[in-house]
């Protein structure tokens, strides 16, 4: 016997799915995925064996939820700015589809659940470090730095660079020098990554009133700083090998990927175009993903010739 689904039920289900997608959009899923990926790599690098499943799943979920909570607050604070920019005008906080109160409640639920998961399945160090990262992004970067200085992405970049240290702490209960090397890599990667985006979206940022480097200092100044920070980033990526935490598999990957990033930065500096800046931005995401994947492969298949 076949029963028909009532059209009102279908409409209600469709609205619920749409609302779920809108709430998910507040968490900036693509950015969150990259952050959690780096945190998971940090977990595996913290131990010579397998990460315990409860820590892996519970810890990653907790970091994911707190990251999503921070991004939701970011969307809330910048809702008027987002409404002015073509890149972000579709966000539910900017359109008003999700209200201020709903966003605050949503962020509080995500943050509370994330803290609980980290307390239960990881440890209190990870819980408080992740909460500090939440405050660093949602308050220090979003509210204080971003509207105040063109160096916002440099000064405030630490919060976005923390995921590997959070993952490491979840497994080891400490944050040693090796974990801070990973943080430094992301910290130095962030300016050239973000400034490439800001260059080809500079009209949007000029309209928003945010003091982004291409708007306040111009194209050539920004291109020079992308090139300089790329060189600093490449130097930072060599630290895991120099310190002995990685072997030649990682070194080869770091040098090859660094050469690719430097080539993009140099081409941008010599012959800028919005299309090339967009390609550089996209490559920077691939770069970080492959670099951390190489760290993981090297960790389990380290090749260091015996002297």
From Swiss-Prot:
Tell me yes or no: is Zinc-finger among this UniProt entry's keywords: no
Per the record, the GO terms for biological process are: heme O biosynthetic process
Q: What is its EC number?
A: 2.5.1.141
Localization recorded for this chain is:
Cell inner membrane
Q: Cross-referenced Pfam families, in alphabetical order?
A: UbiA (PF01040)
The highest taxon in the source lineage is Bacteria
Q: Which Gene3D superfamilies does the record cross-reference, listed alphabetically?
A: UbiA prenyltransferase
The reply to whether Cell membrane figures as a keyword in the UniProt entry is yes
For this UniProt entry, which segments traverse the membrane? 31-51, 53-73, 103-123, 125-145, 153-173, 179-199, 223-243, 246-266, 285-305
Its chief place of residence is: membrane
**What InterPro entries does the database record attribute to this sequence?**
Protohaem_IX_farnesylTrfase, UbiA_prenyltransferase, UbiA_prenylTrfase_CS, UbiA_sf
**Topology class, membrane:** Multi-pass membrane protein
Chemical reaction(s) catalysed: heme b + (2E,6E)-farnesyl diphosphate + H2O = Fe(II)-heme o + diphosphate
Q: Name one GO cellular component term.
A: plasma membrane
Matching PANTHER family: 4-HYDROXYBENZOATE SOLANESYLTRANSFERASE, PROTOHEME IX FARNESYLTRANSFERASE, MITOCHONDRIAL
Entry function: Converts heme B (protoheme IX) to heme O by substitution of the vinyl group on carbon 2 of heme B porphyrin ring with a hydroxyethyl farnesyl side group.
The family assignment reads: Belongs to the UbiA prenyltransferase family. Protoheme IX farnesyltransferase subfamily.
Spell out the note in the miscellaneous section. Answer: Carbon 2 of the heme B porphyrin ring is defined according to the Fischer nomenclature.
The protein in question is named Protoheme IX farnesyltransferase
Q: Which gene encodes it?
A: ctaB
């Amino acid at each position: 016997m076949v029963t028909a689904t009532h059209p009102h039920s279908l409409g209600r289900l469709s609205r619920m799915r749409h609302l779920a997608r809108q709430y998910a959009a507040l968490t900036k899923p693509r950015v969150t995925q990259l952050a959690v990926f780096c945190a998971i790599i940090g977990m595996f690098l913290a131990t010579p064996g397998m990460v315990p499943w409860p820590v892996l799943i519970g810890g990653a979920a907790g970091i994911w939820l707190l990251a999503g909570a921070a991004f939701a607050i970011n969307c809330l604070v910048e809702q008027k700015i987002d409404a002015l920019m073509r890149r972000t005008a579709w966000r539910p906080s900017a359109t008003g589809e999700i209200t201020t109160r709903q966003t605050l409640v949503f962020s509080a639920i995500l943050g509370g659940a994330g803290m609980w998961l980290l307390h239960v399945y990881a440890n209190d160090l990870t819980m408080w470090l992740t909460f500090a990262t939440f405050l660093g992004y949602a308050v220090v970067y979003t509210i204080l730095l971003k509207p105040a200085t063109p160096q916002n992405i440099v000064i405030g970049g630490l919060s976005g660079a923390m995921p590997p240290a959070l993952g490491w702490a979840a497994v080891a209960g400490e944050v040693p020098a090796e974990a801070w090397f990973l943080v430094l890599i992301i910290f130095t990667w962030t300016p050239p990554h973000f400034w490439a985006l800001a260059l080809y979206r500079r009209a949007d940022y000029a309209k928003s009133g945010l003091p982004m480097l291409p708007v306040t200092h111009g194209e050539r100044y920004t291109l020079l700083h992308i090139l300089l920070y790329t060189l600093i980033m490449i130097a930072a990526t060599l630290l895991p090998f120099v310190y002995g935490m990685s072997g030649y598999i990682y070194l080869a990957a770091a040098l090859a990927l660094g050469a690719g990033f430097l080539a993009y930065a140099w081409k941008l500096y010599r012959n800028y175009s919005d299309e090339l800046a967009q390609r550089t931005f996209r490559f920077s995401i691939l770069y970080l993903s492959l670099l951390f994947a190489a760290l993981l492969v090297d960790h389990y298949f380290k090749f260091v010739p015996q002297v």
